Curated annotation (Swiss-Prot):
It comes from the Eukaryota. This is Kininogen-1. It comes from Homo sapiens (Human). The modification Pyrrolidone carboxylic acid is found at residue 19. Residues 28-132, 151-254, 273-376 form the Cystatin kininogen-type domain. The keyword Disulfide bond applies.
């Protein structure tokens, strides 16, 4: 029975030792965190007995540790306020001092929460950047007057050293004190020099019983007593301290709690990736990897990404590393040596290993798992093809053929517009089958009658699609009710731009015409049978380039609701003359653009609106900015600007 009781007590003790405090990042605007910062800032201001109070600017980092007690570890920025310490006001009642005259700082603190309203400062360190302060000049007009000097002046060192020694020898305090910060210094030229120096001191861990004077082993105590001293010293012409007086005020340290300690027996802990204890472990790991790998060449550890160790019945290492293929083959080398260099274009492996080490048996048991990262290779690009362009070869169906290299590609308008936005209605008659038909030869005639009110009539071949021609004869006739033949450009929402001269015009249908749906363009092609139509080709060669049509047709009103971005782009595009039959880039195939590729994926102008937890909101604005006066004039581009 006693044995069972002892085992139960031991298990409970081990369980209590293995409990680890849970730490988590919290919002910098948390209410309890603000109370902890308030306690830390009041603690700091209470130790400053002569200057102005510091006011919170904002909290930059915050972590909450929950265990037997709750602790807040945080960083916060402060600015000097306009309230003196002796004013009796809290820092919340103070305003920021002028930026040119105010000191700033950053503090790191750990505060324990004892109850819902009680917060105790465990540790705190503040780095204060003083303001410019009074101007220090090399010469004054007033001879013999008291003038401020820099607190970093080397002339102050012997006086400060003497002052600290004088304080430690003439006080009843059990510990030695050391210099903390020089706050102000003044000097007066007489028959020698008069100095008046104000500085702060702090208690150290060196007691007077064990140390007669300060040594490098003496360190300041955060929970120790602090003080502020003002020394008056006279240095004669022999640079000796002829007279010295000192006035010091001591402020006892209070309300100190020890920071939380984390005890986790057997928990994994991180170790440096270049730790010497990993050398033997990594050697056995790469040996195990090469023994299990069937590759022709040896692999070598390129870099260690992360390493952890856990104390068990021995030690267990968890290592993440990258292995690279070397130039040493397994056939010509019995083992991996230091002279084996990694291949520049070799294969890489992303590996994680668990290595169990039993020191008293001098045994190591490694287990390695690797995933290939791929092989580095060089790819040839066609000349002029941008490396940043994302593309893929279009899928070739039975009904389509690859376009010849000399065929140029012209953009096509989208014919599937919303008919509700037009002034009139659009009628379309189609004959054919369900699939789109593509012809290498044939005569496709498109007849359109503009009635002046947006009524449009189109005849084509194919079910829902216009007939596509390679190098056939494409005749387009444009007839007005007034029988007036105009080479114009009708801007009507829902139909394509028509370029015409007089009664009709033979156009090269070998240019890729497609239906523009989103960003997808269907490529059509010509057949080798186009040699059977010499008359059409001869007529096309003798015809001059098509002139750029005017933007607006006389007598036709253009409404902005019918105006599209593509209308402006297509209108301003110059005519594309037929490319030469033979070209140096004939071997470059037509590449279908990936609509989801990088070149067509617009990058967002603004980041995501998810607001981070830290840093928090400023306590008070340093300077109020009027958004109505600070906003710059923005220029909004309207497509109507293209009409002017």
């Amino acid at each position: 029975m006693k044995l069972i009781t002892i085992l139960f007590l031991c298990s409970r003790l081990l369980l209590s030792l293995t409990q680890e405090s849970q730490s988590e990042e919290i919002d910098c605007n948390d209410k309890d965190l603000f109370k902890a910062v308030d306690a830390a800032l009041k603690k700091y201001n209470s130790q400053n007995q002569s200057n102005n109070q510091f006011v919170l600017y904002r909290i930059t980092e915050a972590t909450k540790t929950v265990g037997s007690d709750t602790f807040y570890s945080f960083k916060y920025e402060i600015k000097e306020g306009d309230c003196p310490v002796q004013s009796g006001k809290t820092w919340q009642d103070c305003e920021y001092k002028d930026a040119a005259k105010a000191a700033t700082g950053e503090c790191t603190a750990t505060v324990g929460k004892r109850s819902s309203t009680k917060f105790s400062v465990a540790t705190q360190t503040c780095q204060i950047t003083p303001a410019e302060g009074p101007v220090v000049t090399a010469q004054y007009d007033c001879l013999g007057c008291v003038h401020p000097i820099s607190t970093q002046s080397p002339d102050l060192e012997p006086i400060l050293r003497h002052g600290i020694q004088y304080f430690n020898n003439n006080t009843q305090h059990s510990s030695l004190f050391m210099l903390n910060e020089v706050k102000r210094a003044q000097r007066q030229v007489v028959a020698g020099l008069n100095f008046r120096i104000t500085y702060s001191i702090v208690q150290t861990n060196c007691s007077k019983e064990n140390f007669l004077f300060l040594t490098p082993d003496c360190k300041s105590l955060w929970n120790g007593d602090t003080g502020e001293c003002t020394d008056n010293a006279y240095i004669d012409i022999q640079l000796r301290i002829a007279s010295f007086s000192q006035n010091c005020d001591i402020y006892p340290g209070k309300d100190f709690v020890q920071p939380p300690t984390k005890i986790c027996v057997g928990c994994p802990r991180d170790i440096p990736t270049n730790s010497p204890e990993l050398e033997e472990t990594l050697t056995h790991t790469i040996t195990k990897l090469n023994a299990e790998n069937n590759a022709t060449f040896y692999f070598k550890i390129d870099n260690v990404k992360k390493a952890r160790v856990q104390v068990v019945a021995g030690k267990k290492y968890f290592i993440d590393f990258v292995a690279r293929e070397t130039t040493c083959s397994k056939e010509s080398n019995e083992e991996l040596t230091e002279s084996c260099e990694t291949k520049k274009l070799g294969q890489s492996l992303d590996c994680n290993a668990e290595v169990y080490v039993v020191p008293w048996e001098k045994k190591i048991y490694p287990t390695v798992n690797c995933q290939p990262l791929g092989m580095i290779s060089l790819m040839k690009r066609p000349p002029g093809f941008s490396p940043f362009r994302s593309s893929r070869i279009g899928e070739i169906k039975e009904e389509t053929t690859v376009s010849p290299p000399h065929t140029s590609m012209a953009p096509a308008q989208d014919e599937e517009r919303d008919s509700g936005k037009e002034q009139g209605h659009t009628r379309r008659h189609d004959w054919g089958h369900e699939k789109q038909r593509k012809h290498n030869l044939g005569h496709g005639h498109k007849h359109e009658r503009d009635q002046g009110h947006g009524h449009q009539r189109g005849h084509g071949l194919g079910h829902g699609h216009e007939q596509q021609h390679g190098l056939g004869h494409g005749h387009k006739f444009k007839l007005d009710d007034d029988l007036e033949h105009q080479g114009g450009h009708v801007l009507d929402h829902g139909h394509k731009h028509k370029h015409g001269h007089g009664h009709g015009k033979h156009k090269n249908k070998g240019k890729k015409n497609g239906k523009h749906n989103g960003w997808k363009t269907e490529h059509l092609a010509s057949s080798s049978e186009d040699s059977t139509t010499p008359s059409a080709q001869t007529q096309e060669k003798t015809e001059g380039p098509t002139p750029i049509p005017s933007l607006a047709k006389p007598g036709v009103t253009v409404t902005f609701s019918d105006f599209q971005d593509s209308d402006l782009i297509a209108t301003m595009m110059p005519p594309i003359s037929p490319a030469p039959i033979q070209s140096d880039d004939d071997w470059i195939p037509d590449i279908q653009i990936d609509p989801n590729g990088l070149s067509f994926n617009p990058i967002s102008d603004f980041p995501d609106t998810t607001s981070p937890k830290c840093p928090g909101r400023p306590w008070k604005s340093v300077s109020e900015i009027n958004p109505t006066t600070q906003m710059k004039e923005s220029y909004y581009f309207d497509l109507t600007d293209g009409l002017s």
